[in-house]
Amino acid sequence: MKKRISSVGNVVTAFYQMHKKSIFYFICAVLFCLVNQAAAADLKLSFNARYKQNAALLYGEILPGDTQRVARFFIKYPDVQFLILDSRGGDVIEAIRIGELVRALRISTEVADRGMCASSCFFIWMNGAYRLAVAENYRGGSGPVGLHRPFLVNPTNSEGSLQLQSKVMIEVRNYLESNLIPRRLIDIMLTRPSNDIYWLTSDDIEELSPTSPALEELYIGKCQANTRQLLVQLEQANLKKDMQEKSRVEIQLRKMFDCTNGLDLEANAAAIKKLVSGWLPPLPFKEIRKKGD
C-alpha cells in the first residue's frame, strides 16, 4: 500500500506539473540513506529527458574531485536550473562541496523517480533552492531519501580513529544545524548506525519544507511570497471545486514564482560568472581526512 504524502504536497506537485515550463517549485525533504556502495558507478552528469529543458541528471558515486567536474558542467551548460539526483552517495566532504555549489547556483534539486538520494547525496539535495522527494514506498514523480550517521572508511582499531569518527559526527551536526535542519532529524541521523537506515516519513518531509528558512525569508522580503497560505487556498478551492477561486490563486502563484525565479536566475548568473573565473565555494568547516559514508 502506498504511503500518503501531505495533501498540500499533492497540490504543489499537481500545480508544478501544470506550469513546469515557467516555475520551479518542489516540495518534501530528506536525509542520508544507506545502500550497497559496491554497486555504485563513478559520478556522471547528463541532461534529463524527463523535463526536456533546463534539467540535468546527477548519478553515480560521489568521489574526490567531483566538485570541479560539476562546476565545469554548469559552466558549459549555464541554463540548467534543475538537478535530478540518483546517487548512492560517496565521499561526504565532496558531497558537501557540491551542495555548497548548488546553493550558490540557486538551482532546484529533486530525487529521481524510482531513484534515490542515498547517503552523502543528502548534502547536495538539501542545498537546492526548491527540493523534492517522497516518503518511502510512495511511487509517483520522485524518489525517497533516508538517513544514517556518516562514518569513516576503513577505520583502524585506535583511539585516534575513534576520535576522528566523533569529530566527523560533530562537524556534520554543526553543518546541519547551521542550515536549520530540524534537530530531531539530526538526532535520528546521528544515532542511526551506518548499517541501518531510517526512511523519512511524510510528516518528516512536511517538517523540512521545500525551501530553506533563509531563502524563504528572501522570497518573502523581495516577492511578498506567501506560498504556504496560497497552497492552502488552492487546496481548498480544489476541494470545493471553486474554479474562479482556483484561477485567482493560480495567478497569484504564477506571479510569485515568476518573482522568485527571477531572483534565482540573478543569483545563478552571478555564480556562473565566478565559476568561470576559477572560484569554487569554500568548505564550510575545516576538512577532515579519511571520512566517507
Label each residue range with its predicted role:
Residues 146-148:
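Histidine-centered active-site/metal-ligand motif
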Residues 122-130:
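Amphipathic, non-transmembrane alpha-helical segments in extracytoplasmic/periplasmic proteins
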Residues 116-120:
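Short, solvent-exposed linear patches
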Residues 34-40:
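Sec/Tat signal peptide C-region and signal peptidase I cleavage site
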Residues 25-34:
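Bacterial N-terminal signal peptides
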